[in-house]
Amino acid sequence: MSPMNAFDPQAEDSTTTIGRNLRSRPLARKKLSEMVEEELEQMIRRREFGEGEQLPSERELMAFFNVGRPSVREALAALKRKGLVQINNGERARVSRPSADTIIGELSGMAKDFLSHPGGIAHFEQLRLFFESSLVRYAAEHATDEQIDLLAKALEINSQSLDNNAAFIRSDVDFHRVLAEIPGNPIFMAIHVALLDWLIAARPTVADQALHEHNNVSYQQHIAIVDAIRRHDPDEADRALQSHLNSVSATWHAFGQTTNKKK
């Protein structure tokens, strides 16, 4: 019997089939806090409470929804995680606009869990490669003189940090952050910041001396990327970026293998 015939009132076994389908799809019960959260979220999205406006007090919300204080507090906490409200001690929740950082931050826990699984780091490194490849191509085609100057300044700080691994990591992140800023898209920035945070947190601990050569190689590759962007050559910028990130990936993979052997 086809899916359409399964719900044909003329079909001989339609009642049995419908009953079987309903039994196989039990309705999920929602917590009171989830229902309060959904209703408040809809009210905010319908502009019944404008940005910056305070929501009713907990006591008023308890009376309005006929629920207890824990349900109201759980609902408000969920709205805060979504970036829809701000909660300060002693004050009523205030409606806010979710930022790109808030949206990406919601994925942080899942991303870190994914990174801990076999192949997780490789998948995120591939994501970074695809993402930054587009960024450098855009930069080579559209970067202004002022934006190229910012890249050059980030590169200079990079060069001054070669012998200080903590400082080099910061300058390295800042260099790539400038690339992510060039399109002027806040979502790109939020994705880029989170992506680097996740990957750096997943890297193994390595002795400072082992990182010095890696720092210098990365710096030289950064120079190649900036030179290609300055010449407005997207193909060369892309090649330089891919060479750089593939090198970084291989280096940290080797560091990880060495660390595992020592355990």
Curated annotation (Swiss-Prot):
The gene is nanR. The keyword Transcription applies. GO terms for molecular function: DNA binding; DNA-binding transcription factor activity. It comes from Escherichia coli O1:K1 / APEC. PANTHER family: HTH-TYPE TRANSCRIPTIONAL REPRESSOR NANR, TRANSCRIPTIONAL REGULATOR, GNTR FAMILY. GO terms for biological process: negative regulation of DNA-templated transcription. Pfam families: FCD (PF07729), GntR (PF00392). InterPro entries: GntR_C, TF_FadR/GntR_C, Tscrpt_reg_HTH_GntR, Tscrpt_reg_NanR, WH-like_DNA-bd_sf, WH_DNA-bd_sf. The lineage of its organism: Bacteria, Pseudomonadati, Pseudomonadota, Gammaproteobacteria, Enterobacterales. Transcriptional repressor that controls expression of the genes required for the catabolism of sialic acids. Residues 30-98 form the HTH gntR-type domain. This is HTH-type transcriptional repressor NanR. HAMAP family: HTH_NanR. The keyword Repressor applies. Keywords: DNA-binding, Repressor, Transcription, Transcription regulation. Belongs to the NanR family.
